């Protein structure tokens, strides 16, 4: 998704300048794929003919939890359904199966590539994945299953915000932001708010054409309100040159939030671009 968003400002002309005759599918993984980049890749680059194989797995999974089955058809940004051998489910806070709403992505049975533990840290392994529900692996992602059985991801469950009593994942807010042509990437975090409990703060990376445009932040805030409602108007929108990412291009929201609040960002061993931290700063 990060690569798609970075190419999107170049428009369809970029694809027209390349020989794509041997291309049979696009692959996407690492983080939720927002609707606007999905449609750009499918319609403008693939000309509506090349499927987007959106998958979700993890280093600790050593496999694919959710993946597209091209015989099943596609819905924009969907991940199809559980891959072979993966007893995936979406559950509520009590561990009950949930459909049509956002819940925790879990696995109810072992799988061939299952991680057995963390090196010399067995207690941390159990606390990370097995403490919530007995005999159930909690992956740490928000997911949902729609009325047609298609699965969707909504970001990390530990990144969830509670804004005026409404739970929202960063993916919803970020999708609204990157729906603007001026925005290449976004990271949404929640910060303490005396009225709402939490308020969203959004960091955005502008497109090359919008770099230096002082009105980008206002347009991002207005677009989030238009898409999600007035309750989700950001307390602040910060324009930055880059966002901290792991080597697999995942945005490190916990680091963004820690820096914004003046807290210790913790372990940075997986940070790929340390120079990005300079632009975050404290709120």
For each feature predicted by the language model, list its residue ranges:
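Hydrophobic/anchoring residues in structured secondary elements
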Residues: 25-28, 188, 238-239, 273
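AMP-binding/adenylate-forming
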Residues: 1-13, 21-27, 53
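Generic structural signal for residues in well-ordered beta-strands
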Residues: 52, 88, 186-188, 234-239
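Residue-level signal for well-ordered alpha-helical positions
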Residues: 9-10, 121, 164
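AMP-binding/adenylate-forming catalytic core of the ANL superfamily
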Residues: 111, 116-117, 127, 135, ...
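Glycine-centered tight turns that cap/initiate beta-strands
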Residues: 22, 124, 182-185, 236, ...
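Conserved AMP-binding/adenylate-forming
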Residues: 24-26, 32-150, 157-160, 173
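Short, hinge-like loop/turn segments at secondary-structure boundaries
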Residues: 14-17, 68-73, 204-205
């Amino acid at each position: 998704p990060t690569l798609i968003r970075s190419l999107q400002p170049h428009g369809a002309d970029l694809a027209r300048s390349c020989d794509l005759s041997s291309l049979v599918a696009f692959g996407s993984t690492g983080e939720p794929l927002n609707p606007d980049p999905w449609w750009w890749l499918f319609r403008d680059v693939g000309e509506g003919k090349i499927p987007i194989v959106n998958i979700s797995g993890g280093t600790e999974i050593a496999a694919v939890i959710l993946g597209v089955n091209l015989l099943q058809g596609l819905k924009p940004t969907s991940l199809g359904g559980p891959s072979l051998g993966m007893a995936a489910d979406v559950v509520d806070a009590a561990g009950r199966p949930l459909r049509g709403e956002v819940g925790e992505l879990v696995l109810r049975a072992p799988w061939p590539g299952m991680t057995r533990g963390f090196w010399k840290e067995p207690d941390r392994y159990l606390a990370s994945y097995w403490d919530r529900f007995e005999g159930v692996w909690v992956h740490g992602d928000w997911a949902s299953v729609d009325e047609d059985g298609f699965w969707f991801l909504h970001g990390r469950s530990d990144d969830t915000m509670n804004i005026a009593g409404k739970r929202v994942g960063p993916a919803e807010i970020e999708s609204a932001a990157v729906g603007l042509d001026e925005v290449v990437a976004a990271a949404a975090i929640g910060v303490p708010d005396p009225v709402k409990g939490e308020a969203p703060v959004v960091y955005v990376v502008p497109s090359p054409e919008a770099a230096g445009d002082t009105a980008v932040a206002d347009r991002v805030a207005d677009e989030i309100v238009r898409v999600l409602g007035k309750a989700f108007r950001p307390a602040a929108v910060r324009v930055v040159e880059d966002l901290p990412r792991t080597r697999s291009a995942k945005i490190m929201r916990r680091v963004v939030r820690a820096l914004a609040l003046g807290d210790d960002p913790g372990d940075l061993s997986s940070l790929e671009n340390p120079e990005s931290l300079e632009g975050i700063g404290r709120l």
